[in-house]
Structures are given as structure tokens and as C-alpha cells.
């Protein structure tokens, strides 16, 4: 435990908060070849690999994910939500920071219904999350 004198001379250091989605917090300037700290809600990228992985212990499934090379040069793993998808290698996608609890290392989620990622077919509830159009009557 520090003495009062130590606290007066040095003081307490503020603990820096760690971001949950670091790839969204920097942009790349290709002209000057430098990274710039710039927070963004979404980032565009190109799929380099589309595959499945199994979740952590109590759950059992084959979760779809894509390895995405972002516009700032970073490569991240992003989850593909919803049932069925049309993504393949070289598909252009938009990602957001949304961690998947039972997939370790997956901190991002692909936004359905934008760029090359088509919306989920025959979806009636929570349609805006999955880029689904309203069903015709």
C-alpha cells in the first residue's frame, strides 16, 4: 500500500480501457503508408476464406464464418449470421463489431443485405438484422 507522500508525488495511473473491436478503430492511408486512429461503426472487406467451425463446450453446431481482409489492411474473422448464405472467396462484405460468445477469436459479424452478402430468405421476424425484404401478400 502506498504512503500519502508517494500518492502526492506520483498519483494513481488511469487504467486504459481496451477496445473489443480493434480493427474498426484505425484506418490506413495508402499514400503516406500510415495508420490513423479513427473509429468507424462498419468496415468494408473482401472474404479470403469461408468455412465452418465448432463452438465452445456446452454448445454443438457448425457455425459459418469468413476470414475478411479489411480496407485498412487488417485481416479478421467474422461470423455469418442467419440460415444459409451466398458468400464465397472474393465476396465484398461489410462488417460490424459484434462478438460471438461461443466462438473464440470471432469479434466481428457480417451485415446481411449489403454489398455481396444477400439477405436471409423467408425471414419474417427481426428482418432488419438479416437484410430480409418484407414478404409479398
Swiss-Prot record:
UniProt keyword annotations, A-Z: Ribonucleoprotein, Ribosomal protein, RNA-binding, rRNA-binding, tRNA-binding
Region of interest: Disordered: 1-26
GO cellular component: small ribosomal subunit
GO molecular function terms attached to this record: rRNA binding; structural constituent of ribosome; tRNA binding
GO process terms (BP): translation
A UniProt-annotated Pfam family: Ribosom_S12_S23
HAMAP family in the record: Ribosomal_uS12_B
Subunit structure: Part of the 30S ribosomal subunit. Contacts proteins S8 and S17. May interact with IF1 in the 30S initiation complex.
Function: With S4 and S5 plays an important role in translational accuracy.
Entry's family note: Belongs to the universal ribosomal protein uS12 family.
Protein name: Small ribosomal subunit protein uS12
Species of origin: Mycoplasmopsis pulmonis (strain UAB CTIP)
Amino acid at each position: 500500500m502506498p504512503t500519502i507522500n508517494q500518492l502526492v508525488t506520483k498519483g494513481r495511473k488511469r487504467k486504459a480501457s481496451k477496445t473489443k473491436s480493434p480493427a474498426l478503430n484505425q484506418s490506413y492511408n495508402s499514400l503516406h503508408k500510415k495508420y490513423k486512429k479513427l473509429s468507424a461503426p462498419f468496415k468494408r472487406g473482401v472474404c479470403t476464406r469461408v468455412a465452418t467451425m465448432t463452438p465452445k463446450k456446452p454448445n454443438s453446431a457448425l457455425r459459418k464464418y469468413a476470414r475478411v481482409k479489411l480496407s485498412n489492411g487488417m485481416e479478421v474473422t467474422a461470423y455469418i449470421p442467419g440460415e444459409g448464405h451466398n458468400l464465397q472467396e472474393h465476396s465484398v462484405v461489410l462488417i460490424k463489431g459484434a462478438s460471438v460468445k461461443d466462438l473464440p477469436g470471432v469479434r466481428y459479424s457480417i451485415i446481411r443485405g449489403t454489398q455481396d452478402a444477400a439477405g436471409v430468405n423467408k425471414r419474417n421476424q427481426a428482418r432488419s438484422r438479416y437484410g430480409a425484404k418484407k414478404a409479398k401478400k
